[in-house]
Amino acid sequence: PVDKDTIGTLVELLGVIYSPKQPPKLTYGPAKCDISQGDSPASYCPSTNTISVNLPALAQIGTPADMAEKSLIQGDNTAFSIVVSRYMMALESQRGVKLDDPTAALRTACLTAQAQRQMAKPHDLPSGASLQLTAGDLDKAVAGLLTNGYVATAVDGQGVPAAFTRIAAFRAGLSTDDEG
């Protein structure tokens, strides 16, 4: 399920994988930020280094659906990938790259896929919790790229309109090493 525990574990896992010097803070609910953030259920504010999660909206996106419901397959990783993308944006911010243009949106999708590849490996977490992606989880992330595109948005919520472009960026992240 997509809840505070799983989102907390997700952010802990990303911290173990990337060990940022300044890990982003995680909050639930709207956060004050000096830039407009769009309507994504998870956003990143560079000035406060904070990832804000609208948990009810994220949980709805993460509710399992399948072809029997005449819907694209979606599930927890549809929601998790959105949070991962905002964590990647935090890492991008710490590297000093531009966050508010289409290039940033596509770079974020690419980096999200790289993170997803790392999340398919087992990792020991200080809390003792665990989270490891499986092959079917990638389908759920791709479904999100097709239906809402939140993973491929810039810091201000502006995305890339073409779903195939979003998927190409994500695919590049799956097929390249971590140094890009």
Region locations from a protein language model:
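Solvent-exposed loop/turn segments at secondary-structure junctions
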Residues: C33, A57-I61, M88-A90, G96-L99
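Active-site recognition of the HExxH zinc-binding catalytic motif
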Residues: V53, K70-G96, A105, A109, ...
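Extracytoplasmic/secreted envelope proteins and their assembly/folding machinery
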Residues: K4-G15, V84, M88, A105, ...
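Sec-exported extracytoplasmic/periplasmic mature domains
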Residues: E12-S19, M88-G96, A109, A113-K121, ...
